[in-house]
Amino acid sequence: MVLKTVGVAGTLESSDAMITVEPANQGGIVIDISSSVKRQFGRQIEETVLNTIKELGVENANVKVVDKGALNYALIARTKAAVYRAAESNDYKF
């Protein structure tokens, strides 16, 4: 999937996350995580977001995750929504 613009999904409410995905020309997928539980769950958050992005076929992207205690299913849903918005795609594969 080719990213065309910046895609954002989520909120900064408790138990949610805000995911921002933007295109990158090269460098693979770079993930920046901001979370109060990063020391405890940072690796799992990164793994979940990275696997979801790769599953959608994205090869180069800059991703910012602002986590407020989101569970995995919320991270996956928010990441998919942000990627589809960044790709300006309506061809959802749920």
From Swiss-Prot:
Pfam families: ACP
Modified residues (O-(phosphoribosyl dephospho-coenzyme A)serine): S14
Keyword Transmembrane applies: no
Keyword terms, alphabetized: Cytoplasm, Phosphoprotein
Record keyword Phosphoprotein present: yes
Highest rank taxon of the organism: Bacteria
Location in the cell: Cytoplasm
InterPro entries xrefs: CitD, Mal_deCO2ase/Cit_lyase_ACP
A GO cellular-component term linked to this record: cytoplasm
Similarity comment: Belongs to the CitD family.
HAMAP family hit by this protein: CitD (MF_00805)
Function: Covalent carrier of the coenzyme of citrate lyase.
Subunit field text: Oligomer with a subunit composition of (alpha,beta,gamma)6.
Protein's UniProt name: Citrate lyase acyl carrier protein
Organism: Fusobacterium nucleatum subsp. nucleatum (strain ATCC 25586 / DSM 15643 / BCRC 10681 / CIP 101130 / JCM 8532 / KCTC 2640 / LMG 13131 / VPI 4355)
